[in-house]
Amino acid sequence: MKKPLVGIIGNSYKIDNKYPAQGSGTINIEAIAEVSDALPVIIPSLPNYFTIAELLYSFDGFLFTGGRPNVHPSFYGEKATDAHGFFDIDRDQLVLPLIKACEKVGKPILGLCRGFQEFNVAFGGTLYPEIRDLPGRMNHRMPPEGTLEEQFALRHEVIINKNSIFEQIFGTNKVMVNSLHGQGIKKPGKRVIIDGYANDGTPEALSIKDSIGFCLAVQWHPEWNASSDKVSKPLFQNFGENLRLPSN
């Protein structure tokens, strides 16, 4: 049987700080291939080389990955400051209209970390540049030193709304997640439903009201240990199931 084709949004970087390149973390590819049981294809964040319509026609679903650059605040009506970090305008120009287009036609999409923030901005929401600077909030960034296992370790609890799609997927309304982000949702976008919060009030899971297809995003990185983690695995499995629906 033919497997669904999933476009994994790539990130810009430089090999040896010189040669421009596009890529994605191997764990994103493994999660799609092993848990969603789909064919992963990296889509370069170079919007001049293809149209949104071409992407919609070519792929069965999309994974909006994390990435170090932040969404440029001009896309949510604010000016850039030092606190906003650095940006990848090409990725912004690709993903923001792609998210809206996918949601409109019911194409399955899953957002992770930066992808979570992109979902919110795509629907008119805004972001805080640095969560840890807000009163009463904890530091959601990963430890600056340590192994990958230490940096991606489970860090805090997320309280999931009862009767939400996430509670249905996880089978519980309390989950433990990793945390590797600086920014976070300030104002939810139109139709954005916050389905889960960290104990300090930081939004951690979202869905889109009245969406006709799978349209979910989380602030953490479920791609880490996706084949074994009791939260990550059902999320990617459910994504894979939705990729195979006849309506897709």
Language model features by range: what are they?
Residues 216-219:
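Active-site-proximal beta-strand elements of phosphoester/diester hydrolases
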Residues 212-214:
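A short, structured beta-strand/loop element
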